[in-house]
């Protein structure tokens, strides 16, 4: 007799299978990097990525000879020392600043290079991001030579409808912007993205209205901002894409409890769209719960390898 399987169960099995195939590869990645330790690395890029935009940009900047390391994986090392000819940080711009985990990683690590660069990925505005990153890095003995940013899909769901973002003409400029940035870094140019008076006005207005912390604005507790709905099938993808490992499966359903970066990796990568955001005034409710985003050049497996804390 032929057995049947519904879509819900099939997706659950796919999710569990994906976790199983991704997890064994983590030690292999670490091993590859260890083997290269004795060789002088040309370009070393550290990245933080929730929906794949920053990972995609990192790959483009790395080229054939660059080495990529995930910040959520590297941050657990004690007193790490990294050395390369060029060292870069690629991360999303969260509330006009680098994510708290990126700040913590820089503060805990020692970097040795002839050339340092930062590239942010953002949707609407960078405002003071270049200045903040430059001053923050300088406080830990790093002189940034180059700071720029790439405008991409804005994935912050309380304010942006992903469906509209995907239709925005700004996305057509991504290849050109990346080409300019890559050429500049290859030539070791000295540059910092300008911060205008309008940028400062937007920054000040946002923080006055929101009341967020101006150093670590997105740090919170996961149970305060996200929850899984009845659409959850217990596939476990959220437990592996969270850079803090703050999701767990309890009786076949995902439960969020723990530190949160507010990166929304869990929300965007859930195959069932079963994770929703709890509105935090003055922020509105998300305008479109039916559309989620992951960079088309990055797979869920890529993000699991980058972020999993299991």
Predicted regions and their residues:
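Flanking helices and flexible, charged tails adjoining ferredoxin-like Fe-S electron-transfer domains
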Residues: 265-310
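Soluble, non-transmembrane catalytic domains of enzymes that act on hydrophobic metabolites at membranes
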Residues: 119, 150-176, 246-249, 253-257, ...
